[in-house]
Amino acid sequence: MAIMQINFYSKMLKKNTTILAILPVDKPDKKFQKDVDSENLKTLYLLHGYAGNYMDWLCGARIVELSMRYNVAVFLPSGENSFYLDDEEKEEYFGEFVGNEIIEFTRSVFPIPQKREKTFIGGLSMGGYGALRNGLKYNKNFVGIIALSSALIIHKIAGIPKDYRNAYASYNYYRRVFGDLNSLIGSDKDINALVTKLKQEKGSIPKIYMACGRDDFLVQENRDLFNFLKNEGIDVVYEEDEGGHDWDFWNKYIANAFEWMSKVSD
């Protein structure tokens, strides 16, 4: 097992950024052989939630254990509070960063598979939304999406007034992150619209694993998305259980997600 912190210059963010790499190499009973074993790996780009950073998954979940057990290389980037969307004013393109640039960078540096059918994106809360949005927008890069307790908030913030404020942020934040809030529905930030567009274009739609706790304040939005995806004929698994918006729930269901991931093929 190798855990590495990598600092590199991102062209999409126009600054140095840090990612954490967890690689299941050199197991106690078997030495890693790049030419043979790299193609047996799967790769997961795993996104943190609001107010988090690249350390969240390492500190909060059993990611190292799961990486070893399921033979998955895991990469943990920092998305700040961007919802993993592009900010054209600041020229920080977090969507392009997690949807494309980080895949190209890690494939050029690490002994990981180069193929879509081995590549997944996932996340929790804000990161669950980011995984869904960018997994669909950059669908040619990902065979599967893991979305836990996803922050599917666009229908709540679409068209909000300028004096709007909730427990998390204000109109100014949502306007900065999501752009014109009156044009949000139907845009490429709308998960439903992305699915509809891919179906119309006959694009390859990644398989999706979703989970949310019954006591989570986002549970109805996650139910609604699951029902939409199911009605659209998308290959989606949804699990709901007792629990809230916390690491107790995410620890249980990221393990289920790894099990699901082990069975996914293109």
From Swiss-Prot:
<dbReference type="GO" id="GO:0016787">
    <property type="term" value="F:hydrolase activity"/>
</dbReference>
<dbReference type="InterPro" id="IPR050583">
    <property type="entry name" value="Mycobacterial_A85_antigen"/>
</dbReference>
<dbReference type="InterPro" id="IPR029058">
    <property type="entry name" value="AB_hydrolase_fold"/>
</dbReference>
<keyword id="KW-0119">Carbohydrate metabolism</keyword>
<keyword id="KW-0624">Polysaccharide degradation</keyword>
<dbReference type="InterPro" id="IPR000801">
    <property type="entry name" value="Esterase-like"/>
</dbReference>
<dbReference type="Pfam" id="PF00756">
    <property type="entry name" value="Esterase"/>
</dbReference>
<dbReference type="GO" id="GO:0045493">
    <property type="term" value="P:xylan catabolic process"/>
</dbReference>
<protein>
    <recommendedName>
        <fullName>Acetyl esterase</fullName>
        <ecNumber>3.1.-.-</ecNumber>
    </recommendedName>
</protein>
<keyword id="KW-0858">Xylan degradation</keyword>
<dbReference type="GO" id="GO:0016747">
    <property type="term" value="F:acyltransferase activity, transferring groups other than amino-acyl groups"/>
</dbReference>
<keyword id="KW-0378">Hydrolase</keyword>
